[in-house]
């Protein structure tokens, strides 16, 4: 850049700082790059699939999926992990369906959790904005976008048409709160539902409610699906769950994680650690037996997971080894939550157990 351009730029920057304050414009090279702070989801595989060890603070996150797929369970798990770090969390329950007893079983400190059950969509989003601007809240969950009913729709007749009203409400609210979320370094999670588009011949007919604004403003979008049942004998005790990162502005997208959600207990973290430790060579598996550092820890996955539950220091050390390896830049974690690599061993385990 020649001297005249440098002088013109310096004058422009000086005028901008005088008018808008110091830091209104800055060179990116003048400051060291800082890692994006993240809050764990409670699932090791999902934390790794997200690329930064969890959901990013100061950003908007959308979690969507079919009914009973684990959306609320996942967000309550995030709240539980945040509270363990001393964070203050809020739950905007637009669906009026939050079960404190279930939240407590997942590890949420319900006594410290702030809960709001607003009457209208405008009220819910206004409360969310005020909580963000307080700079005192670390995590806010809005459950759900589909339940953010505009005031005009509530006050109108049942058959009245309100085309695009909810989409306009979401668009206006997100324009207003996005900057505040960044300044407050607050994680805001919107839970969303799936609807079907009529007349779609090619591509997926699925779409989410509330218009397109949230798709653009969200830094991370997670598609959560129930893929099967977890059984003990004939009794169904949980769900096999797959989460796909369909959008990620802070790491490479389209990774996915698979884990189990046990009814009344939440994400089966110890079982996930066993699977990932075998997949990446930290735990050896011979037939039905699992060994860690030369010592047998259990016969079968369930017994090995119980060993980790009874020995939290070993569990934490194993989890740290997995995180250190897979969260290193340049490591491919596309199949981090998949179990294809140990399917053959699982067959051998089933044969040994039977």
Curated annotation (Swiss-Prot):
Predominant location: cytoplasm
One of the record's GO cellular component terms: cytosol
Q: Which residues hold ATP? A: 65-72
Q: Please name the GO terms that the record assigns under molecular function.
A: ATP binding; ATP hydrolysis activity; ATP-dependent DNA damage sensor activity; damaged DNA binding; single-stranded DNA binding
PROSITE patterns, per database record: RECA_1, RECA_2, RECA_3
**Keywords annotated in UniProt:** ATP-binding, Cytoplasm, DNA damage, DNA recombination, DNA repair, DNA-binding, Nucleotide-binding, SOS response
Spell out the subcellular localization from the entry. Cytoplasm
UniProt KW Cytoplasm keyword: yes
- One of the GO biological process terms: DNA recombination
Q: Which family does it belong to?
A: Belongs to the RecA family.
What exactly does this protein do?
Answer: Can catalyze the hydrolysis of ATP in the presence of single-stranded DNA, the ATP-dependent uptake of single-stranded DNA by duplex DNA, and the ATP-dependent hybridization of homologous single-stranded DNAs. It interacts with LexA causing its activation and leading to its autocatalytic cleavage.
User: Which PANTHER family did the record assign?
Assistant: MITOCHONDRIAL DNA REPAIR PROTEIN RECA HOMOLOG-RELATED, RECA
This protein is called: Protein RecA
Identify the coding gene: recA
């Amino acid at each position: 850049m020649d001297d005249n351009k440098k002088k013109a730029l310096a004058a422009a920057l000086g005028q901008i700082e005088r008018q808008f304050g110091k830091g209104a414009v800055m060179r990116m090279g003048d400051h060291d790059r800082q890692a994006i702070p993240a809050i764990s989801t409670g699932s090791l595989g999902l934390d790794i699939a997200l690329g930064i060890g969890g959901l990013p603070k100061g950003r908007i996150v959308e979690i969507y999926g079919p009914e009973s797929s684990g959306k609320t369970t996942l967000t309550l798990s995030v709240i539980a992990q945040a509270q363990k770090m001393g964070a203050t969390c809020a739950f905007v329950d637009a669906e009026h369906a939050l079960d404190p007893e279930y939240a407590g079983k997942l590890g949420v400190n319900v006594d410290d959790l702030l809960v709001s059950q607003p009457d209208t969509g405008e009220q819910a989003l206004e409360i969310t904005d005020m909580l963000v601007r307080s700079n005192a809240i670390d995590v806010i969950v809005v459950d759900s976008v589909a339940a953010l009913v505009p005031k005009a729709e509530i006050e109108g007749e049942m058959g009245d048409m309100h085309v695009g009203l909810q989409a306009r409400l979401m668009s206006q609210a997100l324009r207003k709160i996005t900057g505040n979320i960044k300044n407050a370094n607050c994680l805001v999670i919107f839970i969303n539902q799936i609807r079907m588009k009529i007349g779609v011949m090619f591509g997926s007919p699925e779409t989410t409610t509330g218009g397109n604004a949230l798709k653009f403003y969200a830094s991370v979008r997670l598609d959560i699906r129930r893929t099967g049942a977890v059984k003990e004998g004939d009794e169904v005790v949980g769900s096999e769950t797959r989460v796909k990162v369909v959008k990620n502005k802070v790491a490479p997208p389209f990774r996915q994680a698979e884990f189990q959600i046990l009814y009344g207990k939440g994400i089966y973290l110890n079982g996930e650690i066993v699977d990932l430790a075998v997949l990446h060579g930290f735990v050896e598996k011979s037939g039905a037996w699992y060994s860690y550092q030369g010592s047998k820890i259990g016969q079968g996955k369930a017994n090995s997971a119980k060993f980790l539950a009874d020995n939290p220091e070993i569990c934490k050390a194993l989890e740290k080894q997995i995180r250190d390896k897979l969260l290193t830049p340049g490591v491919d974690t596309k199949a981090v939550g998949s179990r294809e690599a140990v399917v053959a061993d699982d067959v051998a385990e089933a044969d040994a157990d039977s």
